[in-house]
Design a protein with these regions (language model features):
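A short, Lys/Arg-rich alpha-helix, primarily the initiator
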Residues: 10-43, 121-134
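Short, charged recognition helix plus adjacent turn
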Residues: 2-9, 20, 88-117
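Short, basic-rich loop-to-helix N-cap that marks the start of a DNA-contacting helix
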Residues: 65-78
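Recognition helix of helix-turn-helix/homeodomain-like DNA-binding domains
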Residues: 52-68, 93-95
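Key DNA-contact positions within bacterial/archaeal DNA-binding proteins
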Residues: 45, 56, 85
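The alpha-helix within a helix-turn-helix
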Residues: 37, 48, 77
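Long, compositionally biased
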Residues: 79-80, 104-133
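Short alpha-helical "recognition helix" segments of helix-turn-helix
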Residues: 43-50
């Protein structure tokens, strides 16, 4: 698979767009989530157990039959101990806004991701700084 940096380089050059589009993989939320689970050696059941989501809702989000809110996608990312890059990819592929360090709540979430906080510890941190817990 071609890296994002390589794609940006090609897009900046005079490479024909059709040639570039042919090498870009078809990415969707479900396949990216599955790849993250596989890379981390995790099962959906284990990850879902570490969230505040109802099991049915969580499985529907993971299977792509229901759109997950930003909070729910972040819960999955925390449970999988994803880094910021992978979390933002999941957020983008689920049509949610990316985490942005200049937004205070997002800065707290980035901090929690980078320090591998679980959902409980992340919610404590959010509440301590006058933000709602992830629901």
């Amino acid at each position: 698979m071609i890296s994002t940096t390589q794609l940006i380089t090609l897009l900046n050059q005079s490479t024909p767009l059709e040639n570039i589009l042919e090498i870009i993989p078809d990415l969707d939320f479900v396949s990216y989530l599955e790849a993250c689970l596989e890379k981390k050696g995790l099962k959906k059941k284990e990850v879902i157990a570490q969230t505040n989501m109802q099991k049915n809702d969580a499985y529907q989000i993971c299977n792509g039959t229901k759109k997950g809110s930003k909070d729910k996608i972040i819960q999955l990312a925390l449970a999988m101990r994803l880094n910021l890059h992978d979390t933002n990819n999941l957020l983008s592929l689920s049509n949610n806004g990316l985490l942005y360090a200049k937004v205070k709540k997002d800065a707290i979430l980035i901090y929690a991701l980078q320090h591998h906080y679980n959902l409980f510890k992340t919610n404590e941190l959010l509440i301590a700084h006058c933000f709602d817990a992830l629901d």
